[in-house]
């Protein structure tokens, strides 16, 4: 296993030990093939939200909203944006002085690869070591960028830290959307960063009741 490893204990009704990778490889660059750029006739594309339907009973995804970070013919991946934990980032990285006065907590990004850490960053400008997903939202797995954001007293960027991700194989998400497990909606920075996590799913469901995204 590459990189330094830090043991993190998340309180989720029971104490769960997670090993979070501190140094991670850069995320795979987004595909630039014509097929990938076109997205899906179901409205699926990088930068969309997939919102769990009321009937989705899988405990991993019930009442969740997943922000798609990658979508192509080989599958899809994203992070759940409305499952925060009560674990402060200062507890996860006790040696990072810049975190000690901050209130941010770790978020559960999904059930896949729970050792993987993903950063979502809100910024109106390009960021080194990050990829723009949609306007004002960038994604990174760079510890260097994370340290810069934490240590800058004048930083205007917001960020969230996610452990794990949601992943689908080729055609899997399309089938789940087609049978009604998920609704597809556009994403925006306000939903990801400003809406209280407990309000994300009901708010999106109300929006979707008016008009689900259709292509």
Can you describe what each PLM-predicted range is?
Residues 1-3:
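N-terminal secretory signal peptides that target proteins for export/translocation
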Residues 5-215:
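A short aromatic-anchored loop/beta-hairpin motif
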